[in-house]
Amino acid sequence: MTDMWKTEGMAAVGAPMDRVEGRLKVTGGARYSAEMPVANVQHAVIVQSTVANARITSIDTATAEKLPGVVRVLTHHNMPKLSPQAGKPPASRFLTLLQDDIVYYNGQPIALVIADTLEHATDAAHRVTAKYASARPVTDMRASNRVSYAPESNGRKPDSTKGSVSAGLADADVRIAATYTTPIENHNPMEPHATIAAWEGDKLTVYDATQYVIGDRNTVAKTLGLSPDDVRLVSYFIGGGFGCKGSVWSHVPLAAMAAREIGKPVKLVLTRRQMYGPVGARPETEQKITLGAKRDGTLTAVRHDSVSHTSRFEDFLEPSAMQTRMLYASPNIETSHRLVKLDLGTPTYQRAPGEATGTFALESAMDELAEALHMDPLALRLKNYAEVDPDSGKPWSSKSLRECYRTGSERFGWSKRSATPGSMRDGDVAIGYGMATATYPTNRQKASALVRLTGDGRGGVRALVQTASQDIGTGTYTVMTQVAADALGLSVEQVRVEIGDSRMPPSPVSGGSMTAASTGSAIDVVCRQARSELAAQGVTDLTSMGAYLDRQPDRSLTVRADSAPGEDARKYSMHSFGAVFVEVRVDRELGEIRVPRVVASYGAGRILNAKTAHSQLIGGVVWGLGMALEEETLVDPRTARYMNADLAEYHVPVNADVGTLDLSFVEEHDPYVNPIGVKGIGEIGITGVAAAIANAVYNATGVRVRDLPITLDKVMEKTRV
């Protein structure tokens, strides 16, 4: 037998292992929330408002209620009242729907139809009519009469001041100031939001497509006035989330309340169009960057002022200026965040919230400063490389950004770039090179896990690991299997990981790129603790391990443990970094922009699975391409209606839009970040990409586009070449 304690080489961790649930998914065996086998389930369909900023004066459900198969139609007139705690922080006021006649945004649920089939429920929903007393909605964040305000701090202060930017600008030889905008963007996961709610007495089971099993359970319990112990939340497989499934939206408690009202399970699945408005989006931003520098490129002043929109009824802040506080060394850095209320649904987190939008502005401005200084953009960034965190003054737990710059620039061929806009051509096609810095914080929260080692009666051993985490398509099942196998000294074939059930030990949200760091650390800790307990009993190898377990009354050993950030989290600043280089080709006659290649290099700590990690980078970079060139949610200013609320008119990149992606990691060892040395890579891939493309478009055409997306009309309107 293999020595149980021999972990040199760590064959399980780091290997490009295929997804353990892959066969289930491709054969249809993986059951998503809408597919869970629940007997006698009834179907619910939401009726949405057609206006915003209004009150319902009347709502007619009589015709719908008479249709075949209709069980109930719920409105604010007959919906049971929620718990007084519903909608209070940290929960959203989105959850208090069908409680009164107020309509905040177009598409807000105003009724819920329950019927025996989806077809019957859909037909009846179309027969519900409402009348409103409405005022013209406010949808333009950049209106001249807008009122902006500083949101209350929820852990991160909206404003920051280091030194004096005014003094730094006075000391500068070169100054630039520019305003950059990003539009509303929607998540568009392949799987829409879906919920099945089933009661058994006073106990509630909810199958929901969620990024946060424990948080979802707690919010549902609070909203309905239940104990969390009386709510079971299950989410075994999720078809993408990207942030919109990290919060509980109104459809979840609506399904639960409907099920309680009719005494039968209720299934509620949103349509694609219903994914626009009721479940959040990335908010619009307007960001002003002011930079000052000496002739040699030394930054003397950095200012980043960001404004984003929120809903009329609650605050959500897009923290676009956060990375500006820590990315470049300068004695004078000031940032601010302001909100503007609009008659739209509340925005929410979307892949790299803050950093995705913020790096577009900051990294575009850095290139504009480089142009004003007649300096290479990469050289400017290296000139202002931050050896410590400029915001906190703390040392980095690790930082490999210099190596990322070197590796990325060499693989890309950055030295061949011509600094003169429009000078690189291939016939009627203008070629441009651009680059940007990528960054994302390393987040970690407390997590718990359980391991049960079982003997098979013949000296063999199997391990079951449980934690209430969730796999949103990132490979959590697979990576956690590798972590457990490595910590136990077992093969991956001997390990089974179970997640997605609130009855398991709690884990945090799958967001903020923290699952590997949080849940992975908990699994590593509990498995090593189990190994230590076995060692105390004289177990020295797999043979003695199996024999020991076979002698136990139930042939097993069960251990549960927690893992949480410690003192190192207070001593060090923890971030992932990367460098993105892109080539664009712009048709000089048509303005069409193509991105034939992206080369990017990242330093993100220990890589747990080379294949899933590379997959995450591909996804992030493709998201960056969409952000730069295609994605924009359009709102009708007259009605506040989303005008392109489907995948036909909301444009996202397809295979034909994506060129060669050369994405790599530099080796990075971080002994301080967490027990397994990982930083998380789910979001860094999108950061910097939009700016690199904008910078490349300028290099190709001489046109500086500061308003995303960069569409051909914006290029043709100002083209100089």
Regions flagged by a language model, labelled:
Residues 1-154, 175-178, 251, 261:
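Flexible, low-hydrophobicity surface segments
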Residues 146-224, 385-462, 641-665:
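Helix-loop-helix junctions that connect adjacent transmembrane helices in secondary transporters/permeases
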